[in-house]
From Swiss-Prot:
Protein's UniProt keywords contain Zinc: no
Cofactor binding note: Binds 1 [4Fe-4S] cluster.
Main subcellular location: mitochondrion
Transit peptide start-stop: 1-33
Protein's cellular compartments: Mitochondrion inner membrane
Modified residues (Symmetric dimethylarginine): 118
Pfam families attached to this UniProt entry: Complex1_49kDa
Record note on quaternary structure: Core subunit of respiratory chain NADH dehydrogenase (Complex I) which is composed of 45 different subunits. Component of the iron-sulfur (IP) fragment of the enzyme. Interacts with NDUFAF3. Interacts with NDUFAF7. Interacts with CERS2.
Name of the protein: NADH dehydrogenase [ubiquinone] iron-sulfur protein 2, mitochondrial
Matching NCBIfam families: NuoD, PRK06075.1
Length: 463
């Protein structure tokens, strides 16, 4: 800058400069009489900054020190935000997770739900009590008859009726078959997500046999609409109880094969032990139920504590975990399958003869044979299936021990043939709320294992 100032003081051709590398002073010769422009002090100050066209913002910029002594400024490192699902095969339906990752460590896990919302609770308000029943098959579409059982018990409580003993035993029988269906799906797809393919193929063969039992008793493989207010739709066909007995006799061997594949498998233990730990306190605070609660060491099973139908007449044990991790919950589900086999065999041995519907013509439709001969029965059938039956005003909360946890139905009647309000309490909703707590600090791959152990189905979460 000092050299520029000295240069600007010189005028005209008398200005002389030193050519680099030579000691000879040469006069500056203006070309064709034109005066040669030289940068002055103002120009150098204006354009000598950080940018070519400075502004107020750039005026405050200071050049960094050109050495390695001064430490660089601390910079903020932001975590990676990742979308998991909803099209991911391990998302078990339409789960979308917005995860915050630090490297491969999960810092935050935010579930976004509602992608399978169908407005079930509102639709039920526009249907009769019988027409509302099939909606429950489509909530937790892996354990269909358990959902029907909860709704039927709620309607029966409002009607103040009790189904005959045979109907109650059939309900318990198929409730435990449904529990087997659900736990096979839960355990094998959990293993499939982690990378064990064999149990999935082995156990789904058994699952197919149980779907055949569904089909023989109701005509449908999945959405049965078999358990109805007042009893069940129709009696067991001939030979079905023998086939269920043969199935249950051999099914414990299939469970042994499943445990042989997984229980002491080194890779399975590495992927599940100490993953997704839930303490007993957290399980209660989050409102967990079912295996998610029992895996943490709390022995709570509505079939024992608040028995419904004929669960007070069957003997079974309630398995609980000790650590509250994925491995304990897996062991609980496997043991529950063994206990379900015990209950099924007791149901087959204690199945009484008799009616399968309540003896109340205002609730139960007449038999097909009567409709063919009696005009009054035909009219009665028509009125029941078009207008439905009136339910006395009242409200009830009825809960059962569904395979995933406590499935509750809060039913309000205003005295008409349609429910005034039907609120459904799904166990998977509370479990999904605890996903952030369970997955924090784990690796990204462990989130898949945690979703699998929660046994989430989005039909009931989104409703």
């Amino acid at each position: 800058m000092a050299a520029l100032r000295a240069l600007c003081r010189l005028r005209g051709a008398a200005a002389q400069v030193l050519r680099p590398g030579a000691g000879v002073r040469l006069p500056i010769q203006p070309s064709r009489g034109a005066r040669q422009w030289q940068p002055d002090v103002e120009w150098a100050e204006q354009y000598g900054g950080a940018v070519m066209y400075p502004t107020k913002e750039t005026a405050h910029w200071k050049p960094p020190p050109w050495n390695d002594v001064d430490p660089p400024k601390d910079t903020l490192v932001s975590n990676l935000t990742l979308n998991f699902g909803p099209q991911h095969p391990a998302a078990h339906g339409v789960l979308r997770l917005v995860m915050e990752l630090s490297g491969e460590m999960v810092r935050k896990c935010d579930p976004h739900i509602g992608l399978l919302h169908r407005g079930t609770e509102k639709l039920i308000e526009y249907k009769t009590y019988l027409q509302a029943l099939p909606y429950f098959d489509r909530l937790d579409y892996v354990s269909m008859m358990c959902n029907e059982q909860a709704y039927s018990l709620a309607v029966e409580k409002l009607l103040n009726i009790q189904p005959p003993p045979r109907a109650q035993w059939i309900r318990v029988l198929f409730g435990e078959i449904t529990r087997l269906l659900n736990h096979i799906m839960a355990v094998t797809t959990h293993a499939l997500d982690i990378g064990a393919m064999t149990p999935f193929f082995w156990m789904f063969e058994e699952r197919e046999k149980m779907f055949e039992f569904y089909e023989r008793v109701s005509g449908a493989r999945m959405h049965a609409a078999y358990v109805r207010p007042g009893g069940v739709h129709q009696d067991l066909p001939l030979g079905l109880m023998d086939d269920i007995y043969e199935f249950s006799k051999n099914f414990s061997l299939r469970i042994d094969e499943l445990e042989e594949m997984l229980t002491n498998n080194r890779i399975w233990r590495n992927r599940t032990v100490d993953i997704g730990i839930v303490t007993a306190e957290d399980a209660l605070n989050y409102g967990f139920s079912g295996v998610m609660l029992r895996g943490s060491g709390i022995q709570w099973d509505l079939r024992k504590t608040q028995p419904y139908d004929v669960y007070d007449q069957v003997e079974f044990d309630v398995p609980i975990g000790s650590r509250g991790d994925c491995y304990d919950r897996y062991l609980c589900r496997v043991e529950e399958m063994r206990q379900s086999i015990r209950i099924i065999s007791q149901c087959l041995n204690k199945m009484p003869p008799g009616e399968i519907k309540v003896d109340d013509a205002k609730v139960s439709p007449p038999k097909r044979a009567e409709m063919k001969t009696s005009m009054e029965s035909l009219i009665h059938h028509f009125k029941l299936y078009t207008e439905g039956y009136q339910v006395p005003p009242g409200a009830t909360y009825t809960a059962i021990e569904a395979p995933k946890g406590e499935f509750g139905v809060y039913l309000v009647s205003d005295g008409s043939s349609r429910p005034y309000r039907c609120k459904i309490k799904a166990p998977g909703f509370a479990h999904l709320a605890g996903l952030d707590k369970m997955s924090k600090g784990h690796m990204l791959a462990d989130v898949v294992a945690i979703i699998g152990t929660q046994d989430i189905v989005f039909g009931e979460v989104d409703r």
